[in-house]
């Protein structure tokens, strides 16, 4: 529908009908000193001028760099078929499937997505997703609070600081007791977390691999939490789950993930995907939409939104969350991506990423003054200490077309010299070699 402004005659007619003389009369309730005297808007531009302006702004983005950035968001290859299939109109423009008789295709796609992520994480149930990895952790924490009727939450400092900042914002007015257990050289302090998880604890929250890329086994911690009747929440990197011990094998009650690495392109601000799974015992605390499969009176398979009494369109303030829009299109991208790769393809993606990361660790730590932050096992990401501030290394190499990683000191005190380096299947061995040569040249 085109935007056609009202003519002056139409404006006068509308003002006359409502009994005012001018548009300004509509704002008389706003004190004059609070009204802007002028918006100082520039004159309008032609279509060609607007296009040129947008291209000028877009050119400020660097798209020609080789990146080793990670920290929870990774540049994996996305098959072209993902965009081709997801952009079909029946998916791209579909609305929330409240009417199952008219939405079987959308509902089945969500059901298949739920099935896929449950198999990947070895959990019982999944929802249709939430906004992103950070909101998924928050919703998991609130599930635990509702289930246990407790207010204390223990969170590992090695959980992404980006997500922990989100949690602080989400919970600022909820009267929750967030206890952060300090990490030790990028590793989880298991003993300290066990000590913090007591009979007053609602949940313990961890990440695997953690923000520093370290792979941990939380089986004992989760068993201890269960003995205290506290829930176990784990955030995972879904690509690495194809080769690591699953949340289900560790005994997690709730497993969540940032789903960006499965079919979502890197984008500042998203949209991304919050994967949420849990055990059967926790499913009624799950927020968002859940699709179930059943048979109708004629024996035909049908898909419906199930357990809807949890949702805000049924219970309003008493719902498990106020999520009203979901990331179903992003969830579909993840489903298509997983189906195109298959189990072997996903495992191969993880293996290639890990091979390159191990080669990068060998090459970088061979440089004088560079040493690993710890000796723990890692997946496709690791942290090293440099003889200069990591910010300086990032700035100098980025200017030359290589982003060497993420400066950890941005979020962790005392780690200004720590660089977080991530590799995916898109980073070649040649690129890793060039990175090592460039880094060695400035140290």
From Swiss-Prot:
Region forming the signal peptide: none
Keyword check for Oxidoreductase, yes or no. Answer: yes
> What keywords are annotated for this sequence in UniProt?
Oxidoreductase
Give the E.C. number(s): 1.4.4.2
The molecular function terms of the Gene Ontology recorded here are: glycine dehydrogenase (decarboxylating) activity
Can you state which reaction this protein catalyses? Answer: N(6)-[(R)-lipoyl]-L-lysyl-[glycine-cleavage complex H protein] + glycine + H(+) = N(6)-[(R)-S(8)-aminomethyldihydrolipoyl]-L-lysyl-[glycine-cleavage complex H protein] + CO2
State the Gene Ontology BP annotations: glycine decarboxylation via glycine cleavage system; nucleoside metabolic process
Matching entries from InterPro entries are given as: GcvPA (IPR023010), GDC-P_N (IPR049315), PyrdxlP-dep_Trfase (IPR015424), PyrdxlP-dep_Trfase_major (IPR015421), PyrdxlP-dep_Trfase_small (IPR015422)
Q: Which residues form a coiled coil?
A: none
One matching Pfam family is GDC-P
Q: Does the keyword Oxidoreductase apply?
A: yes
Concerning HAMAP family, the annotation shows: GcvPA (MF_00712)
Indicate the quaternary assembly.
Answer: The glycine cleavage system is composed of four proteins: P, T, L and H. In this organism, the P 'protein' is a heterodimer of two subunits.
Summary of the function given for this chain in its UniProt record: The glycine cleavage system catalyzes the degradation of glycine. The P protein binds the alpha-amino group of glycine through its pyridoxal phosphate cofactor; CO(2) is released and the remaining methylamine moiety is then transferred to the lipoamide cofactor of the H protein.
Entry's family note: Belongs to the GcvP family. N-terminal subunit subfamily.
Designated name of the protein: Probable glycine dehydrogenase (decarboxylating) subunit 1
What gene does the UniProt entry assign to this protein?
Answer: gcvPA
């Amino acid at each position: 529908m085109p935007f056609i402004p009202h003519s002056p005659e139409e404006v006068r007619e509308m003002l006359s009908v409502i009994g005012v003389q001018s548009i300004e009369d509509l704002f008389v309730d706003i004190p004059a000193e609070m009204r802007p005297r002028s918006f100082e808007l520039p004159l309008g531009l032609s279509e060609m001028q607007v296009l040129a302006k947008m291209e000028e702004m877009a050119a400020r983005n660097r798209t020609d760099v080789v990146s080793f950035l990670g920290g929870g968001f990774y540049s994996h290859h996305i098959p072209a078929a993902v965009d081709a299939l997801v952009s079909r109109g029946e998916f791209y423009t579909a609305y929330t499937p409240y009417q199952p008789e008219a939405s079987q295709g959308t509902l089945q796609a969500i059901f298949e997505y739920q099935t896929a992520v449950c198999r990947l994480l070895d959990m019982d149930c999944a929802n249709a997703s939430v906004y992103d990895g950070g909101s998924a952790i928050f919703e998991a924490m609130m599930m635990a609070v509702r289930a246990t009727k407790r207010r204390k939450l223990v969170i590992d400092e090695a959980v992404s600081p980006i997500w922990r900042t989100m949690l602080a914002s989400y919970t600022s007015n909820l009267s929750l007791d967030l206890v952060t257990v300090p990490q030790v050289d990028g590793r989880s302090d298991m003993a300290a977390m066990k000590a913090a998880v007591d009979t007053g604890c609602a949940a313990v929250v961890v990440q695997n691999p953690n923000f520093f890329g370290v792979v941990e086994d939380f089986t004992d911690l989760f068993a201890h939490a269960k003995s205290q009747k506290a829930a176990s929440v784990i955030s995972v990197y879904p690509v690495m789950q194809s080769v690591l011990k699953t949340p289900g094998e560790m005994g997690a009650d709730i497993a969540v993930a940032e789903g960006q690495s499965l079919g979502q392109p890197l984008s500042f601000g998203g949209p991304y995907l919050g994967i949420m799974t849990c055990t059967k015992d926790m499913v009624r605390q799950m927020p968002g939409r859940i699709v179930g499969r059943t048979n109708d009176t004629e024996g035909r398979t049908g898909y419906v939104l199930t357990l809807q009494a949890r949702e805000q369109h049924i219970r309003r303030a008493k719902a498990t969350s106020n999520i009203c829009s979901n990331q179903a299109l992003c969830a579909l991208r993840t489903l298509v991506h997983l189906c195109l790769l298959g189990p072997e393809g996903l495992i191969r993606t993880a293996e290639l990423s890990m091979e390159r990361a191990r080669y990068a660790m060998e090459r970088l730590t061979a440089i004088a003054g560079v040493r690993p932050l710890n000796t723990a096992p890692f997946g496709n990401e690791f942290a090293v200490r440099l003889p200069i501030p990591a910010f300086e290394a990032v700035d100098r190499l980025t200017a030359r077309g290589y982003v060497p990683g993420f400066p950890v000191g941005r979020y962790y005190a005392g780690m200004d010299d720590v660089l977080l380096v991530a590799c995916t299947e898109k980073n070649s061995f040649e690129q890793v070699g060039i990175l090592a040569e460039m880094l060695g040249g400035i140290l």
